[in-house]
Amino acid sequence: MKENYCLQAALVCLSMLYHSQAFALERRSHLHPSFHGHHEKGKEGQVLQRSKRGWVWNQFFVIEEYTGPDPVLVGRLHSDIDSGDGNIKYILSGEGAGTIFVIDDKSGNIHATKTLDREERAQYTLMAQAVDRDTNRPLEPPSEFIVKVQDINDNPPEFLHEIYHANVPERSNVGTSVIQVTASDADDPTYGNSAKLVYSILEGQPYFSVEAQTGIIRTALPNMDREAKEEYHVVIQAKDMGGHMGGLSGTTKVTITLTDVNDNPPKFPQSVYQMSVSEAAVPGEEVGRVKAKDPDIGENGLVTYNIVDGDGIELFEITTDYETQDGVVKLKKPVDFETKRAYSLKIEAANVHIDPKFISNGPFKDTVTVKISVEDADEPPMFLAPSYIHEVQENAAAGTVVGRVHAKDPDAANSPIRYSIDRHTDLDRFFTINPEDGFIKTTKPLDREETAWLNISVFAAEIHNRHQETKVPVAIRVLDVNDNAPKFAAPYEGFICESDHPKALSNQPIVTVSADDQDDTANGPRFIFSLPPEIMHNPNFTVRDNRDNTAGVYARRGGFSRQKQDFYLLPIVISDGGIPPMSSTNTLTIKVCGCDVNGALLSCNAEAYILNAGLSTGALIAILACIVILLVIVVLFVTLRRQKKEPLIVFEEEDVRENIITYDDEGGGEEDTEAFDIATLQNPDGINGFIPRKDIKPEYQYMPRPGLRPAPNSVDVDDFINTRIQEADNDPTAPPYDSIQIYGYEGRGSVAGSLSSLESATTDSDLDYDYLQNWGPRFKKLADLYGSKDTFDDDS
């Protein structure tokens, strides 16, 4: 705005200056004799004439862009033969005569009727002639003169480009030339400073600078790194009037890239491509190809394609085929012929790599327009929603309407639609659908606790073309009703300590219980805990509802004893918050246990009373395990010995040795000299090295219950061994063996002593072995060998 005011003021000043000069010129033409044909009057009005006849005029000037209301007076033509009687007629011809410049044929005044622009035309050449008005006879020969258009500063500087793109190698030295921007001013460079330009940088410091006179942009910082910042935006200003105040200015933007460039940008061979795609095409299908040619090779010839604009930018995409350097246009989303039948894309091809040796070839990219038409196709039905969600109450009767799906044919034919359920998604056939209107109904009552959501798929197909089919997911939520009573959240069990005092454990907390309900939260909490009405005043225990879906069980009294009752069953009623509420009775088992002085549980089994005072549960388990292992070993060994077959031994006299061997095992060989000593079973307390102390009174003593004390361990072992011996003696099928089975524990009062060797039968020893006859068939061989001769003879 300030520059416009300055321009208007300058125009007014120049106009006034011109009129004063024209007036002065006209006066000089009358006063100075240097102008030919000029009349001059003296003070008394006498006309003085020069000796030489001719034109009295000068070179004329007119200011450009004059916008006054009256035509501009350019100058005046006058001949010295003009006496002022009107007989002379002035004629003007030449450039602009009669259109731009007009002359008063009587006075010779020349006016400019149009606004002149020096930038369009700087001067006009005209021809003047004086003729007789009546006869048109030339009175003087034609004379040529020039009208010059005087310049004013009415044109700002203009750059050759609105936006410049330049590249410079990264890490260049300070002062490295980047690019030169050039501006031109249409004003007269020979007149004043209207066309004298000075360049300056408005944006881009401190990275770049510009030479004020040449417009060369240079780097101002060293070691600029492309990896840190690749692109810079610089604004350059060019100002006329030598950069002084009042001058006009113009700006340009320079984008400087710290990267390599190549010398050939890609170019499309044509400006428009025509393509087509069917509305039945699926996303990813190729629509067409475009190709921008780049004469460079290698990495400098690689081209990438992008869709930069267009109404189909969301429906189509373009990829680069690096083998052929083609831009492949593909379908990104389905198109609909009935919605829109044509799309337009603006595709840009750009180089991947830029060569730093060629920085003045401009931007390395090109654009092309691609027009894509959509072809009609028979489309399947289209559901009004991409998915459906319906709700139904659980336990609803068969035939209850769940909801509806709706589809229509998008084609102009608008074919009727038939609906069906994908039975792969409804294997239990919970639902059925009306094929004509799409209403979904139940076929049986549903249970939310089994399945809260049911997901099925519904098909919609054209009645005349079953292949045109569409599927939509339908989610059915089963709404909850209060059909499940709450119950214990876990199998709870309570414990209470024995006590002698009846009030010792009064109000003692025993256990905290919580509940769980399979129904939804709306029909679940808050749970209410209570005792059944019939035992509301239970003398032993009470239930206190904590009002947080838990309840505490407390003892009403003390004096619990395992001898009297070792456990109690407490029924607890739990009600939920549903409408109507449901309840269930749950039984809590409370065991009476032995505790130490601190209340810690020691044992909750009533059988603990029958155990010895100093024997722990771990010791009992160890003893029982040892007994079982020994019994298994004995049974296995006896079984193996019974199955063993040995040849009949023939004793020779020289084989008898004079020694007696004592066998402590059941084995019959000399190598079996070790036996299992089960004497420790006579004292179970000594198994683990623990002997009860008699000098200290135990803190807890178990009182044995009459009639439940087990028999001593020794009796059990005796019975077992004697039973096995009787079975062996009475087995008629058992073959005879030459070895005797010796048991490590033979019972009380065994009359059998040590056996001598076989040689003792032939010695003169007074040993009597007649008792072998009483040992049964297994010892018959020994009885025959060692018996007395009389006995032998009697048997024989």
From Swiss-Prot:
It is a single-pass type I membrane protein. Residues 641-796 are cytoplasmic. It is found in: Cell membrane. Residues 1-24 form the signal peptide. Residues 54-159, 160-268, 269-383, 384-486, 487-612 form the Cadherin domain. Keywords: Calcium, Cell adhesion, Cell membrane, Cleavage on pair of basic residues, Glycoprotein, Membrane, Metal-binding, Phosphoprotein, Repeat, Signal, Transmembrane, Transmembrane helix. One of its GO terms (biological process) is modulation of chemical synaptic transmission. The chain crosses the membrane at residues 618-640. CDD domains: Cadherin_repeat. SUPFAM superfamilies: Cadherin-like. Residues 25-53 form a propeptide. One of its GO terms (cellular component) is Schaffer collateral - CA1 synapse. The keyword Transit peptide does not apply. The modification Phosphoserine is found at residue 788. The keyword Transmembrane helix applies. PROSITE patterns: CADHERIN_1, CADHERIN_2. Pfam families: CADH_Y-type_LIR (PF01049), Cadherin (PF00028). Interacts with PCDH8. Cadherins are calcium-dependent cell adhesion proteins. They preferentially interact with themselves in a homophilic manner in connecting cells; cadherins may thus contribute to the sorting of heterogeneous cell types. Required for proper focal adhesion assembly. Involved in the regulation of cell migration. This is Cadherin-11. The lineage of its organism: Eukaryota, Metazoa, Chordata, Craniata, Vertebrata.
